[in-house]
Each structure stands twice: as C-alpha cells, then as structure tokens.
Amino acid sequence: MILFGAADPDDPAHVRSVAYLARLDEPGFYLAGFALIEFDIVMKSRGLNYRERMVRHALLARDYPLTTTRVKPLSPEILYLAARMEGEDRIDYFDAGVAAEAKVLDGHVVSTDRVFDRLPGLKRVW
C-alpha cells in the first residue's frame, strides 16, 4: 500500500511510493479515499491508539500535502460499485473500494496488489 510505503523509509516500496505520491500534482492523479480509510483502520488494527493515528495522519499531510486535496469524494455510485465488486468479483472490501473509485475516474489503479489485474476495465500501474 502506497501510504504505508511512503510513511516508512525502511519499507521496500518506500522510494516508489513517494514517487507516486509526488505525481498527485499531475492532472488525473488522485489518492483513493478508500486508501485513506484503509490506512487508518489498519493502523488501528495494529494497536495504534487515536493519538498515534492522529500523528501519522498529521505527518502524512505535512510530508505529502497533496494527499489533503487530491482525493476524490466518495459517492453512492462508488459505494454501490464497491459492494458489487466485493460480492461478485470476490475481492476484499478495501480493494473493491479502490477499484470502484478507479472505475468511476479513469480505470487506473496504482498498486502492487495483483488482484486489480483480473478486474475488467482496470489497469494496474506500479
């Protein structure tokens, strides 16, 4: 996941994650809202308390300010598609959300997760 890769300099995907976040200033590049939700929920599931999560979000905004503005809002259409993809394509909730956002926007997903390769109408970039 790009947000975890960017947040951890020791992560093997750090350099590439930072490079993709830097592209948020390009037309057509956006951060999936579902990616932000997943970032927070995974931190919570790993035992980070609310203050630790607040710090991580503040650092993300400080270090990568475009993550605060280059996020498309979620909509009923995206949530409908995400639910459909989760059930019919049998993919995980967050992957379905990211895929739905990409389908509504332009069909491109920046991810290391190969699940996106098998979804029609999507192109995974990494």
Range-by-range predicted roles:
Residues 2, 38-42, 81:
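A general alpha-helix detector
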Residues 1-31, 45-57:
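Short, well-structured N-terminal submotif of metal-dependent ribonuclease cores
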Residues 63, 71-72, 99-126:
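Acidic, PIN/NYN-like endoribonuclease modules and their adjacent C-terminal/linker elements
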Residues 9, 33-37, 58-87:
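Acidic catalytic patch
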Residues 2, 35, 78, 98, ...:
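Alpha-helix capping/helix-boundary segments
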Residues 28-30, 66-68, 108:
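Short loop->beta-strand "edge-of-pocket" segments that line small-molecule binding or catalytic clefts
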